[in-house]
From Swiss-Prot:
The protein, known as: Maturase K
The protein's role, per its UniProt record: Usually encoded in the trnK tRNA gene intron. Probably assists in splicing its own and other chloroplast group II introns.
Matching PANTHER family: MATURASE K
tRNA processing is among the record's keywords: yes
GO biological process, one term: RNA splicing
A single Gene Ontology CC term: chloroplast
GO molecular function list: RNA binding
Name of one Pfam family that matches: MatK_N
Subcellular localization, as worded in the UniProt entry: Plastid, Chloroplast
Alphabetically ordered keywords of this record: Chloroplast, mRNA processing, Plastid, RNA-binding, tRNA processing
Similarity comment: Belongs to the intron maturase 2 family. MatK subfamily.
Length: 510
């Protein structure tokens, strides 16, 4: 973002959130190219044709020469701005990528320049970026909680809701009209939330723009949620202060109190949130609300959220999208893990003079288990095994060198071990590694027209076992004690890595 500040300071229009002129600047598309990496439309399109920034210059010149542009899907035949139809989608992609960078500017600059960010060094802390930092938080807090709400956040049915929520920050009407143009050109934007059900251009090319819009939409409702929690508990929150403009939310809350049908007193709403043990986390479209309160309080939360979405955001959500579960009896399905709170019993014999008695200690423990069935399904889809989990050869890799084949299998295995290192039970993870190991052996045996047994006998099974041992396990063998109860094996406890910033593809079965 320092690069953005250096370029944008040349033009004072950004201070008033007027971003439409930036669409005509070439360096914006250069930033989009750098951040998009190999997924950028500036690199390649569906036809594998290479593109450079020269096409951006042609596009900008065409925009300068255009006197007017009809922003209506019903008049697409009259719109000769983009020329031929095969160029139309390409130009849409280029402008949308540049626009995605532009709309992120005010929020990124505000986060960097925020006194709270400088005071708490939020930006400098790389560990806070890790999605796995959520699980140590679970381990610390969930042992003392009773109930949890699993919430599937609804997304806007009407695209105008996205524009209306963004207009509080972006004062430039031209930019908002351009945003409407993108939204109505690709109407099936919710395919980003359920990518397996759609092959739309959204899910493949415009993820940056629409992920931003979706996260901003969620941030709007979360902001009021945090505000109510702060007002009720009189605690200061720093997690969202750098991103929110309090004046707007005070006005929204006054409107919220007026339109609510289930309460007329703002104090009653605050009383609902008076829970010092309330914790909230979110990843993508799923959020977790955990509390030490009773079942009655969690039902109040459930119906408050349903009414809040409907009254304030015109979103209708079914009650079955919010599940109320007791932590001691149900597992939490979140980010590729089954998490639960279970009781560990330990019996201690105590001897006092001539009498002895047993003491049964029950200790709560936060347990995380790898979701084995979705992982096997993902491996079967990638042709590493069948649907029953039996390893098969990867036939498309038989033309590669032996070292390349082993390297590819080993990289997948190390990535899985890295992502699922926090699992408290490694048996499922070892089963996945075993499938990959035998799939690698079958692939090499098929390439050399041999059997797996003969191939392993010639190479030695220790070779593959040594290769599939991760670097982390080698380091842990030096710094952590060995578990004497498992034949001198390595430490098998949970180990969370705080350098993971996105969910693993094989963990995301949605």
């Amino acid at each position: 973002m320092e690069e953005f500040k250096r370029y944008i300071e040349l033009d004072r229009s950004w201070q008033h959130n007027f971003f439409y002129p930036l669409i005509f600047q070439e360096y914006i598309y250069g930033f989009a190219y750098d951040h998009g990496l190999n997924k950028s439309i500036l690199l390649e399109n569906a036809g594998d044709k290479k593109y450079s920034l020269l096409i951006v210059k042609r596009l900008i010149n065409r925009m300068y020469q255009q006197t007017h542009l009809i922003l209506s899907a019903n008049h697409s035949n009259q719109n000769d701005f983009f020329g031929h139809k095969h160029k139309k989608n390409l130009y849409y992609q280029i402008i949308s990528e540049g626009f995605a960078v532009i709309v992120e500017i005010p929020f990124s600059l505000l986060l960097i320049s925020s006194p709270e960010a400088e005071e708490n060094q939020i930006v400098k802390s790389h560990n806070l970026r890790s999605i796995h930092s959520i699980f140590p938080f679970f381990e610390d807090k969930f042992l003392h909680l009773n109930y949890v709400l699993e919430i599937l956040i609804p997304y806007p049915i009407h695209l105008e809701i996205l524009v209306q929520t963004l207009r509080y920050w972006v004062k430039d009407a031209s930019s908002l009209h351009l945003l409407r143009f993108f939204l109505y050109e690709y109407r099936n934007w919710n395919s980003l939330i359920t990518p397996q059900k759609s092959n739309s251009i959204f899910s493949k090319r415009n993820q940056r723009l629409f992920l931003f819009l979706y996260n901003f939409h969620v941030c709007e409702y979360e902001s009021i949620f945090f505000f109510l929690c702060n007002q009720s508990s009189h605690l200061r929150s720093t997690s969202f202060g750098a991103l929110l403009e309090r004046n707007y939310f005070y006005g929204k809350l006054e409107y919220l109190v007026k339109v609510k049908t289930f309460t007329k007193d703002f104090c009653l709403i605050l009383w609902l949130f008076k829970d010092p043990f309330l914790h909230y986390v979110r990843y993508r479209g799923k959020s977790i609300l955990a509390s030490k309160g009773t079942s009655l309080l969690m039902h109040k939360w459930k119906y408050y959220l349903l009414n809040f979405w409907q009254c304030h955001f015109s979103l209708w959500s079914q009650p079955r999208r919010i599940y109320i579960n007791r932590l001691s009896k149900h597992s939490l399905d979140f980010m590729g893990f089954f998490s639960s709170v279970r009781l560990n019993s330990s019996v201690i014999r105590s001897q006092m003079v001539a009498n002895s008695f047993l003491i049964d200690n029950r200790i709560k423990k936060f347990d995380t288990i790898v979701r084995i069935i979705p992982l096997v399904g993902s491996l079967a889809k990638a042709k590493f095994c069948n649907v029953l989990g039996h390893p098969i050869s990867k036939s498309v890799w038989t033309d590669l060198l032996d070292s390349d084949i082993i390297d590819r299998f080993g990289r997948i295995c190390r990535n899985l071990s890295h992502y699922y290192g926090g699992s408290s039970r490694k048996k499922s993870l070892y089963r996945i590694k075993y499938i990959l190991l035998l799939s690698c052996a079958r692939t090499l045996a098929r390439k050399h027209k041999s059997t797996v047994r003969a191939f392993l006998k010639r190479l030695g099974s220790a070779f593959l076992e040594e290769f599939f041992t991760t670097e982390e396990e080698k380091v842990l063998s030096l710094i952590l004690p060995r578990d004497s109860s498992i034949s001198g094996g390595l430490y098998r406890g949970p180990f969370w890595y705080l350098d993971i910033i996105c969910i693993h593809d094989l963990a995301n079965d949605e």
